[in-house]
């Protein structure tokens, strides 16, 4: 008997049939692939859910036309093709499958290591050309070699476990992993430069952020052993591709395996294509296994089914588990919590062991858990980028050994709408920031390390701690002016005259590393931190 559903789901990219069968349990499923934006806008208003892969662009215009839409499901990890902020504003849940391709991506990195070590692609090409080059392609064993893992998340951890089972010694760089967690994995934590100097193989498992873009450049490559090899199956843009090509040609390193690129597809004139030996290239195949495609389809289809049945989603990219009314009411507070978390992480540096949230005044009357999640998302996203969302932030914090404490003080009346204070404790000391939401939803930073300030957050900021003495503000302003850095705003907070003070500058452009060193060199300045919000 044909079942009729009031609920409709649009599948606009090719999805594994296992996912379609799950959706068929609760909705009418229409599969229409290859739609243009205008075509999608023309039909999306009829649908309660949309399931996509990377092909469909879910723009603000598409979301505006989706008057019935409750959920967008991305069968995969990345959601760059979805306007998540607009979806959040419209109360549309966005979900993905952050773990569905973990094994596939990890195994591809390992396959790259083995292919590089035994020259598999080049030997195969020689056989196809009629050659028998046994001497030319003498390789190396992985056994008893040192593997350096940059990023000990789910994928990096799986690579580490398999590598250990093959007899490799594993070292890792991940400032957000607790030492005891690494010890449980029998992985030695080290600094990034030490890892590159020591490792025979380096595998990258980090997101692309402002801090990781071109992280692996010519200078870092020159610190590696000439016999070392590097693999990137994480995100394009974290390695300088021209520098990689040159390093292999000049014998600075023995080889590289790349699956992802700064711009995809890889340009025909890319210098990587001209490297004849020691380089293995694949066209972004990390998640391209039958099992991974089935896993992500099932995972996301189950989440869409659950949401349509009124149940929570397990991998929401935007705020989960809140009604549209509560979400709208708390939106400025959650934005403040995320901003403070992002700010304090950049001030703290190093590994944060504990984060304490102090809810004061009216803030104490609101549900605390959404604020905790938002704060953790901010705290971790400075290093982990878009891989952190409102669902996995708590899990990622727990995996990194970060303890969360909550304190509520409804009696506090420092601001009409209350305030939120976040304190971190870690291997580089304690840091504290406080903020409030003013009239009209305006966010304000009201104290830093107990120094009172009144600062509106901006995209680029510079924080300093200095001695309160004549001339420092003028020297800093002159230095920034000499380097063509425009100051948009400035606040100074102090407790006593001519004691210690903090200075907060809103600036129009990021501070380059060389300029930051010059700032720190000013007499009386004790520390300086550039912050991106």
Where do the model's predicted regions map?
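Short beta->alpha connector loops at strand-helix junctions that form conserved
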Residues: 32-33, 53, 75-76, 91-103, ...
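Rossmann-like dinucleotide-binding domain for NAD(H)/NADP(H)
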Residues: 90, 94-95, 218, 227-347, ...
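Phosphate-binding beta-alpha-beta segment of Rossmann-like dinucleotide-binding domains, i.e.
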Residues: 90, 98-146, 150, 158-165, ...
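An N-terminal-biased, well-structured beta-alpha scaffold segment characteristic
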Residues: 2-95, 217
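Rossmann-like adenosine-cofactor binding region
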Residues: 56-63, 175-271
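Hydrophobic/small residue at the entry helix of a nucleotide-binding pocket
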Residues: 155
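Oxidoreductase and adenylate-handling cofactor-binding alpha/beta cores
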Residues: 106-125, 145, 164-168, 298-311, ...
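A conserved regulatory-domain signal marking ACT and ACT-like small-molecule sensing domains
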Residues: 321-533
């Amino acid at each position: 008997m044909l079942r009729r559903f009031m609920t409709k789901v649009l599948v606009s990219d090719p999805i594994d049939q296992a996912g379609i069968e799950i959706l068929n349990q609760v909705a009418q499923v229409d599969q229409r692939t290859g739609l243009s934006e205008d075509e999608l806008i023309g039909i999306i208003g009829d649908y309660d859910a949309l399931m996509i892969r990377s092909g469909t662009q879910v723009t603000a215009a598409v979301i505006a036309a989706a008057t019935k839409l409750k959920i967008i499901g991305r069968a995969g990890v990345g959601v760059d093709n979805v306007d998540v902020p607009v979806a959040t504003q419209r109360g549309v849940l966005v979900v993905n499958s952050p773990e569905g391709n973990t094994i596939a991506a990890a195994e591809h990195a390992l396959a790259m290591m083995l292919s590089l070590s035994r020259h598999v692609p080049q030997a195969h090409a020689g056989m196809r050309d009629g050659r028998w080059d046994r001497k030319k392609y003498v390789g190396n064993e992985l056994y008893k070699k040192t593997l350096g893992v940059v990023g000990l998340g789910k994928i990096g951890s799986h690579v580490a476990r398999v590598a250990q089972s093959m007899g490799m010694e594993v070292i890792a760089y991940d400032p957000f992993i607790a030492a005891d967690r690494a010890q449980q994995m029998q992985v030695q934590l080290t600094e990034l430069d030490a890892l590159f100097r020591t490792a025979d193989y380096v595998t990258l498992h980090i997101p692309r952020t402002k801090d990781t873009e071109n992280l692996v450049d010519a200078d870092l490559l020159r610190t590696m052993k000439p016999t070392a090899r590097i693999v990137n199956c994480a995100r394009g843009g974290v390695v300088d591709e021209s520098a990689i090509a040159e390093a292999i040609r000049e014998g600075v390193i023995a080889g590289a395996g790349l699956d992802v690129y700064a711009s995809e597809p890889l340009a025909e004139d890319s210098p990587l294509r001209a490297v004849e030996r020691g380089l293995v290239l694949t066209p972004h195949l990390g998640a391209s296994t039958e099992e991974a495609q089935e896993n992500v389809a099932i995972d996301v289809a189950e989440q869409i089914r659950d949401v349509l049945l009124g149940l929570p989603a397990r991998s929401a990219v935007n705020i989960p588990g809140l009604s549209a009314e509560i979400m709208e009411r708390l939106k400025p507070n959650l934005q403040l919590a995320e901003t403070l978390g992002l700010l304090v992480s950049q001030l703290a540096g190093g590994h944060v062991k504990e984060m304490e949230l102090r809810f004061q005044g009216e803030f104490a009357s609101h549900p605390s858990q959404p604020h905790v999640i938002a704060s953790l998302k901010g705290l971790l996203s400075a290093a982990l980028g878009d891989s952190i969302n409102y669902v996995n932030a708590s899990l990622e914090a727990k995996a990194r050994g970060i303890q969360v404490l909550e304190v509520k003080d409804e009696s506090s009346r420092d601001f009409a709408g209350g305030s939120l204070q976040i304190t971190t404790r870690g291997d580089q000391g304690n840091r504290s920031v406080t903020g409030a939401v003013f009239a009209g939803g305006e966010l304000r930073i009201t104290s830093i390390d107990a120094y009172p300030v009144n600062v509106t957050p901006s995209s680029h900021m510079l924080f300093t701690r200095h001695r309160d003495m004549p001339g420092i503000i003028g020297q800093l302003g002159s230095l920034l002016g000499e380097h063509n850095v425009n100051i948009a705003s400035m606040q100074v907070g102090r407790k006593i005259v001519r004691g210690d003070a903090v200075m907060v500058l809103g600036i129009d452009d990021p501070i380059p590393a060389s300029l930051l060193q010059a700032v720190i060199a000013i007499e009386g300045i004790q520390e300086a931190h550039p912050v991106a919000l």
